[in-house]
Amino acid sequence: PYVSTHPMFGPTFANLGNLSKENTIIIAESDHLGKVFFKDLYTMLKLNICEYTFEEHDKVVAYSLGIPFASTLVFASIMKHQDAPGTTFKRHMKIAHGLLSEDDYLLTEILFNPRTPNQIERIQEQLTILLDIINRKDAAAMKEFLTRVRKNIE
């Protein structure tokens, strides 16, 4: 018997003194008593608990970790020192520093998830669309793009 869980937070960004806004996954195929143990433990820690199959877990991780990890790595890969960075830039840099302070093995495992490449392809598709709009200086298309993006985050 085994039990598999995946806390969806780490010491870099989570407030370990108050985990009530953090999530954890318990794998559905795990041993029943092991799941009960971790559900009790995570409930005491006030974590939001989701139970997923291994397949569902991989989809969630590719989406909720693969996308921001890849986006942050691409951002950081072209960075240079800025004497007068804007607030958005500074926030992105803080995220990049935090992500890159994580263990290389963890980052690699998230990015090598078999479902991550599809998510990165989706990013590339949207970058291609955005670049085309910018190159054409198409204000109407930009407005449509921004409207669609805003709906995505509602």
State where each predicted segment sits.
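Rossmann-fold dinucleotide-binding core
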Residues: 1-49
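An accessory alpha-helical subdomain
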Residues: 51-154
